[in-house]
Design a protein with these regions (language model features):
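ATP-dependent adenylation/nucleotidyltransferase module used to activate substrates
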Residues: 1-204
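Iron-sulfur (Fe-S) cluster-binding segments and ferredoxin-like electron-carrier domains
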Residues: 154, 222-223, 228-249
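Residue-level signal for alpha-helical context at structural boundaries
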Residues: 180, 184, 219, 245-248
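Immediate flanking context of iron-sulfur cluster ligation sites
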Residues: 204-225
Length: 249
């Protein structure tokens, strides 16, 4: 059986990516990161997802991106943008209405350069580099990552150009590449809408109740329903005609 490394955050996209990896006949080796993100709930979600899909090898790498900051996800001084901080009343607390705004492209949680404050500088570059090292050690020639370039937050490291560049790097900077063995960076969700990802997950039997997407969950771990990630998730489920099974505030 072919072996593959799967980047697993515990979110909706990475869970579907893991399921696709298994469907395609790979033995998945999941890799998650405790990188100084605000909430350890992400790691717990990744562990639940991995267990539900009977992943035998799930590694959790600890790195600290808080040393750089620069993102609302790693720097407590930068607030995670939420719609209810810009609007008032019941409308601001309605995740379905917020999801509709997300689907129509009204997300405006960006810096002056257009990049959202929730972008973690070089995160996918770092994660893929770790995955590349892991793949070399276990003899895997495939790395799966759940990035999406259709319904996404505008992160520069979720674009096809970035993946193509990293694919080239993988061929130049590894023992396998020098030996003429191609290391493949696979992004099966890249051209799918969030609704299509949800439908694919349903078809593959993904238990979305185990996943976590929220950037700013409540103390009881309920999703806020108002951050960028929640809005994209809710819009995807709504458009797919599927009920989102997680709890919202």
């Amino acid at each position: 059986m072919r072996h593959a490394v799967v980047l697993l955050s515990g979110g909706l996209d990475s869970a579907v990516t893991l399921a696709l990896c298994k469907r395609d006949g790979f033995e998945p080796h999941a890799l998650s990161f405790e990188y100084g993100q605000r909430h350890a709930i992400e790691i717990a979600a990744a562990q639940r997802v991995a267990a539900s899909m009977h992943v035998q090898d799930h590694r959790i790498a600890t790195i600290d991106l808080r040393v750089f900051g620069g993102s609302a996800l790693t720097d407590e001084a930068i607030e995670v943008p939420r719609r209810h901080s810009e609007r008032s009343g019941a409308e601001s607390r309605n995740p379905v209405e917020a999801a509709t705004r997300a689907a129509t492209g009204s997300l405006d949680f960006a810096r002056d350069d257009g990049i959202p404050v929730t972008y973690v500088p070089a995160r996918n570059t770092i994660f893929l580099s770790y995955a590349l090292a892991f793949a070399e050690v276990i003899g895997a020639s495939d790395i799966f990552i759940g990035v999406n370039a259709v319904d996404y937050s505008g992160y520069p490291d979720c674009r096809p150009e970035f993946l193509a560049a990293f694919q080239q790097l993988a061929g130049l900077a590894t023992k396998a590449g020098v030996q003429g063995k191609r290391m493949m960076i696979r992004a099966p969700l890249l051209a799918l809408s969030k609704a299509e990802i949800v439908r694919e997950g349903v078809k593959l039997g993904v238990d979305f109740a185990l996943t976590h997407s929220c950037y700013a969950p409540a103390e009881d771990r309920a999703a806020c329903g108002c951050c960028d990630s929640c809005q994209l998730r809710l819009a995807g489920f709504r458009e797919a005609g599927v009920k989102d099974p997680i709890r919202y505030v």
